[in-house]
């Protein structure tokens, strides 16, 4: 079947785990290289640990009164006096618009809701219930501890691959040892 082919592969991450006889002499370990599951049970089987986080910073904080609309199309209206954080990540960076008014991010170790529509270049979060919050604080879209890629994928009705692969070129990659 293989003839004179020197290198043959037909196994990606899932095949490597579940069909080792199909590996031939090369494999394409995709998502498992980053520590994410390609199929149910992969994390335990290989002791996978996710290696990437998606992080930004608060660029602006503002307290608004009750009944204030947030974002385009007035899709969110505050029910109480609310402290709103603006974060410079939007759908052009890979944050799904479907997370508008239903997603969460992590600030100072706590989950806070995304409010209003996710915009092209930014989104807003309700930080009213955080004891301390300042402009410049880290914001995790995912950190693999408090919020995972899998949680985000589920909220978006998709798979972890799509969440990771749609982080755009605009987002700087920082490699650490």
Per-range role (PLM):
Residues 1-177:
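Active-site anion/phosphate-binding pocket segments in diverse small-molecule metabolic enzymes
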């Amino acid at each position: 079947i293989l003839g004179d082919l020197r290198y043959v592969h037909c196994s990606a991450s899932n095949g490597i785990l579940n069909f080792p006889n199909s590996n031939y002499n090369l494999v394409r370990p995709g998502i498992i290289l980053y520590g994410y599951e390609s199929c149910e049970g992969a994390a335990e089987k290989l002791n996978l640990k996710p290696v990437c986080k998606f992080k930004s910073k608060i660029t602006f904080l503002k307290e608004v009164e009750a009944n204030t609309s947030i974002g385009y199309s007035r899709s969110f209206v505050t029910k109480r006096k609310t402290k709103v954080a603006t974060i410079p990540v939007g759908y052009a960076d890979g944050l799904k618009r479907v997370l508008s008014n239903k997603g969460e991010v992590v600030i100072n170790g706590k989950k806070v809701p995304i409010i209003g529509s996710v915009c092209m270049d930014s989104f807003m979060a309700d930080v009213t219930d955080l004891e301390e919050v300042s402009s410049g604080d880290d914001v995790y879209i995912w950190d693999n501890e408090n919020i995972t890629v899998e949680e985000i994928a589920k909220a978006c009705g998709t798979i972890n691959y799509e969440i990771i692969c749609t982080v755009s070129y605009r987002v700087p990659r920082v490699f650490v040892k």
